[in-house]
Amino acid sequence: MQVSRRQFFKICAGGMAGTTAAALGFAPSVALAETRQYKLLRTRETRNTCTYCSVGCGLLMYSLGDGAKNAKASIFHIEGDPDHPVNRGALCPKGAGLVDFIHSESRLKFPEYRAPGSDKWQQISWEEAFDRIAKLMKEDRDANYIAQNAEGVTVNRWLSTGMLCASASSNETGYLTQKFSRALGMLAVDNQARVUHGPTVASLAPTFGRGAMTNHWVDIKNANLVVVMGGNAAEAHPVGFRWAMEAKIHNGAKLIVIDPRFTRTAAVADYYAPIRSGTDIAFLSGVLLYLLNNEKFNREYTEAYTNASLIVREDYGFEDGLFTGYDAEKRKYDKSSWTYELDENGFAKRDTTLQHPRCVWNLLKQHVSRYTPDVVENICGTPKDAFLKVCEYIAETSAHDKTASFLYALGWTQHSVGAQNIRTMAMIQLLLGNMGMAGGGVNALRGHSNIQGLTDLGLLSQSLPGYMTLPSEKQTDLQTYLTANTPKPLLEGQVNYWGNYPKFFVSMMKAFFGDKATAENSWGFDWLPKWDKGYDVLQYFEMMKEGKVNGYICQGFNPVASFPNKNKVIGCLSKLKFLVTIDPLNTETSNFWQNHGELNEVDSSKIQTEVFRLPSTCFAEENGSIVNSGRWLQWHWKGADAPGIALTDGEILSGIFLRLRKMYAEQGGANPDQVLNMTWNYAIPHEPSSEEVAMESNGKALADITDPATGAVIVKKGQQLSSFAQLRDDGTTSCGCWIFAGSWTPEGNQMARRDNADPSGLGNTLGWAWAWPLNRRILYNRASADPQGNPWDPKRQLLKWDGTKWTGWDIPDYSAAPPGSGVGPFIMQQEGMGRLFALDKMAEGPFPEHYEPFETPLGTNPLHPNVISNPAARIFKDDAEALGKADKFPYVGTTYRLTEHFHYWTKHALLNAILQPEQFVEIGESLANKLGIAQGDTVKVSSNRGYIKAKAVVTKRIRTLKANGKDIDTIGIPIHWGYEGVAKKGFIANTLTPFVGDANTQTPEFKSFLVNVEKV
């Protein structure tokens, strides 16, 4: 019998109809007719937040397996959360590859140990790791602990072991890290902010009062002008950049870009102007001069809301590149003259007519008068007509009904003048009246997903949570310390909110030391380590080089790739007695002792460092909160267990710390009280829950808290606090981080809220997550209205006065002072004003000044040849000698990110490694033609510190600029390669970069240095 294929299936189906096979769905006709099931139907959905950049995109993670025995959950799909106000379901190429990151073959599963001189890892147990690390730390602490300094002052510090803290770990991990390190007396505590956005805090806080992004991602849509300078938002923050495009498409906004390269952001801009790397201050000072000369500023705003009218001391001055008070030997200023003339009551003298020759307004005019369009062109290489066109665009937003939003990132921060780059733009925004406005602001686009939060929590050498300062050895007792850090108003009647410093500090000490902190022992003041100088990462690696450091803990950080002068970093790590890495991934730092040929040429047998490689969980494997660039604290949930026996950072820190406590309790040693009195009273001490830690960070009442005016109880004993306004300085409140007060209230976890309603249409989704401070979305929003309370632009009205209080579409960033009261909108400042003149808050001057990069292609400073580079920037002797000169290294090198990669992480993720598999550098067409370099050639890029090899991408995107009579060519160097990961092996870009940083924060000068390039 002959049958067709179709007939055959019919016969088979009929014969199977009553069989078990048919019951299981194997009958072809049944299978063919069945509707295909939705592949996510049987999965578990978990909400999380992207671990990469600071946009803070919402995620939906899907896993199979219900967590029962033999059914371990495994995440197999991740997509954007469509309900999230910022990303609305979208993800960038990095976020699209998150599953490959979670399941990377580079994920660590077991603790491992590398013995001194060994060339291999050996697997050990957690008990062995914790016991050995605790033993090494205690031995080092007991041998090198400094209880008193040479003057006999109690300092209780430990300098010979340090800790490098993470950039993407949760706030709860960060808070535990702060307690862990300070309980041991550590001062060498630093995080990713030191090498990225440290200058943001150092510039925005002196200018406005707080060192954070002033607005938020969605608010960018309200701008009439978006200026991207010192960053490449389309590449580095693509989903956040959609809001700039939203402004263009739906608000008619113009987008302008000023950058050494024609970037992906420039590709969609309305106008692009080139600039020589490292000359932003000259360019922006020229903009200031243009605004002043053409009266393109908001006069009423400037007079009422800035310190333009305040009178500066007669002995302040500036001449030939230096402000008054400079000490060339110390490379520091005596800043005593950088302040106001005071009246008999201690308030600043003022001339509201702006006629006094010593008022800030006239000193500013005098200072920027040198930055004419011709001077800008000569220094920056920007054609004069292009510069003036940018000025015109910016000047238009001085109108009351227009705003400009300025977006910047590491292109501004990673210079030896990084903080002053940002301050110059902040001054422009004050003149334009764009601060506090919807669609305005100075918007720092943070690089890492929680670098904002970890900075908020004070994981820096001289910091404490909430931007408080760790005591110095000059502050010998609590009262001296509080007096030094509690400012007095400089104008009558101002809020001066830092005047509440004692409440913030005492409440933090109660969170740290609990019942052990009492008024009698000054709330445990002497248990905090006291610093003599900053122990930032550049300082600390210099100490390593000198043999003064024995131990180092790297938590979620890869300094071999991330720090300047890779060869110096390798040499420093080789001098340690022990190194502990805590990371989900295998990193170059954990393997610094391995020989990888010219990528890392070392002799393992000569490196005597004991190395511990401890596997930690990643973002998808723990609960917790992180803070995006817009200050939103967003809670995320665990979607799966970590591979192998990896632990959370909190469990790892607890494992080490609890062993140290046990040893100090049983054996004694150097200042056991400092270690034993730190609270660690979690329900499961070796496994603190994120929820417990978040509640501790928020704070609670330790006794009934009463209203000072009425005596009524406003918070009952044991209850969570709802606001930092409830904090007290008498020990009756506990709060680990005062700016996070309100994040976990009696009503529950505010960070987990998911109401994305936006009734104003301005993007202020007050019911989504929680923003510090007190859920305010736009900082300084009282400045959105004039002194009488009328909005500058009714379409952007944020606040209104209802007769008794301020209300509106945002939480008022202000007191209850009524319109016309004269209380300024910058409530953290002593004057209540934004500062055009920064007083003594900046290292190199109260006004910004153009200084050349330490490796300048010009060899001089056209403004003042005797003061070429930042005179207040610190540089060590050997690093100064390692600086290159333009005769041997004639081109400007600058490093940057690609949209397909995230720093040194995504080379471990297969999808991203496929998208950008091979290391390359960008060379302008004219230079390539001159050097005989063609597309795809292998080239060697060298500085005075080392070299890398990469493929050449010859491009029109980088042009030759003319500055001070010289042709200036730039070499673009993406940073993402190394000798670990699934991507093709490559050189570490920071082999090339100089070991010098911003004068205020020591953030390295990655964006402008000298190189040579040659065809291999």
Curated annotation (Swiss-Prot):
One GO BP annotation of this record: anaerobic respiration
Signal sequence annotation: 1-33
SUPFAM superfamilies listed in its UniProt record: ADC-like (SSF50692), Formate dehydrogenase/DMSO reductase, domains 1-3 (SSF53706)
Main location: periplasm
Iron among keywords: yes
This protein's GO CC annotations: cytosol; formate dehydrogenase complex; membrane; periplasmic space; plasma membrane
UniProt remark on cofactor binding: Binds 1 molybdenum-bis(molybdopterin guanine dinucleotide) (Mo-bis-MGD) cofactor per subunit.
Reactions mediated catalytically: formate + NAD(+) = CO2 + NADH
Domain 4Fe-4S Mo/W bis-MGD-type span(s) in chain numbering: 43-106
GO molecular function, one term: formate dehydrogenase (NAD+) activity
Compartments (UniProt record): Periplasm
EC class of the enzyme, as a word: oxidoreductase
The keyword Iron appears for this protein: yes
Binding site for [4Fe-4S] cluster: 50, 53, 57, 92
Required cofactor names: Mo-bis(molybdopterin guanine dinucleotide); [4Fe-4S] cluster
PROSITE patterns xref list: 4FE4S_MOW_BIS_MGD, MOLYBDOPTERIN_PROK_1, MOLYBDOPTERIN_PROK_3, TAT
Modification after translation: Exported by the Tat system. The position of the signal peptide cleavage has not been experimentally proven.
EC number in record: 1.17.1.9
Cross-referenced Pfam families: Molybdop_Fe4S4 (PF04879), Molybdopterin (PF00384), Molydop_binding (PF01568)
Entry keywords, A to Z: 4Fe-4S, Iron, Iron-sulfur, Metal-binding, Molybdenum, NAD, Oxidoreductase, Periplasm, Selenocysteine, Signal
Function: Allows to use formate as major electron donor during aerobic respiration. Subunit alpha possibly forms the active site.
Subunit annotation: Formate dehydrogenase is a membrane-bound complex, formed by subunits alpha, beta and gamma.
Similarity section: Belongs to the prokaryotic molybdopterin-containing oxidoreductase family.
Protein name: Formate dehydrogenase-O major subunit
Phylogenetic lineage: Bacteria, Pseudomonadati, Pseudomonadota, Gammaproteobacteria, Enterobacterales
Gene: fdoG
